[in-house]
């Protein structure tokens, strides 16, 4: 039996302050703390007890089970079209995009064909994988800002990234699966790579190119769960960008000391010198 789930069962995935220090561990191993109760995060708790039920059946000898924790999947035919919101902005001639906290967040992603490879490796090595839980994801992970850059390059375009504090970067929520924080969700996939020999079948940059090509030929058919009010998002983005410009102008008027970093290691000029010109 191969079961497939995801990240919501990890404590802190939705509510970073459930952990100390706040936010998930980077990298995030399979044995990290999980949601403990419905009160903490009901959806995550249901994921957690579902995993437990699968593995209990394995322990009881009813079947041999392996559980795969999938990342955010991208590529053709995905029900959650996160990349589409970047593609659509470029098609709509938007020159900039609001991202939370400079778009530095890493949310583990996996190209559909690569994640299918993870399943096949599990099938082929059933005995070795039996009773195990594996995080899955592309070997090469990108920040949000990087995947915006990659998508824009694939469309022969560019897109300026406007950094807005995560609390106010609401137009980007569709791309973050509704997350209201910018903490990383960066899986540790060492077990899958070292035990089952996983490596990306399709390199990530090529995978994004294929994804863009798919969306250009097959715009997603959206439903009430996946549609987005882009007109409202664009209006909100324009307001946020205007405020951002005003703030930067205020920063530029400040007289700030430009501290020059000096490392602590001495640079003696000749043999026998005990200190250099900086007294190190």
Features from the language model and the residues they span:
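Active-site beta-alpha turn of Rossmann-fold NAD(P)-dependent dehydrogenases/reductases
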Residues: 5, 58, 69-71, 137
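Alpha-helical substrate-binding/gating segment
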Residues: 87-97, 105-142, 149, 153
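Residue-level signal for the nucleotide or nucleotide-sugar donor/cofactor binding architecture
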Residues: 45, 110, 139-142, 187, ...
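Hydrophobic/aromatic beta-strand patches that form the interior of the parallel beta-sheet core
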Residues: 2, 66-68, 134
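Flexible, glycine-rich beta-alpha linker
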Residues: 63-87, 105
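Mid/C-terminal beta-alpha module of Rossmann-like enzyme folds, strongest
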Residues: 124-189, 195, 209-210, 222-225, ...
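N-terminal Rossmann-like NAD(P)+-binding domain of SDR-like oxidoreductases, especially those catalyzing
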Residues: 1-39
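Active-site Tyr-X1-5-Lys
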Residues: 27-67, 82
């Amino acid at each position: 039996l191969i079961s497939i789930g995801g990240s919501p069962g990890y404590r802190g995935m939705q509510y970073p302050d459930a952990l100390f220090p706040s936010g998930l561990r980077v990298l995030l191993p399979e044995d990290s703390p999980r949601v403990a109760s419905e009160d903490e995060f009901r959806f995550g708790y249901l994921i957690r007890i579902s995993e437990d039920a699968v593995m209990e059946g394995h322990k009881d000898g009813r079947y041999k089970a392996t559980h795969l924790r999938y990342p955010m999947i991208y590529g053709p035919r995905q029900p959650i079209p996160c990349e589409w919101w970047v593609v659509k902005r470029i098609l709509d001639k938007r020159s900039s995009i609001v991202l939370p906290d400079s778009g530095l967040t890493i949310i583990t992603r996996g190209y559909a064909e690569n994640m299918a490879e993870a399943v096949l490796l599990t099938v082929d090595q059933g005995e070795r994988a039996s009773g195990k839980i594996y995080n899955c994801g592309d070997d090469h992970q990108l920040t949000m800002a990087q995947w915006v850059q990659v998508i824009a390059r694939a469309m022969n375009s560019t897109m300026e990234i406007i950094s807005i504090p995560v609390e106010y970067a609401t137009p980007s929520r569709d791309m973050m699966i509704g997350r209201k924080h910018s903490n990383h969700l960066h899986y540790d996939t060492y077990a899958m790579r070292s035990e089952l020999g996983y490596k990306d079948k399709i390199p990530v940059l090529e995978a994004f190119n294929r994804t863009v090509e798919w969306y250009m030929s097959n715009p997603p058919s959206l439903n009430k769960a996946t549609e987005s009010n882009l007109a409202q998002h664009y209006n909100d983005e324009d307001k946020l960008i205007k405020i951002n410009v005003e703030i930067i102008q205020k920063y530029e008027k400040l007289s700030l000391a430009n501290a020059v970093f000096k490392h602590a290691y001495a640079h003696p000029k000749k043999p026998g010198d005990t200190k250099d010109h900086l007294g190190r």
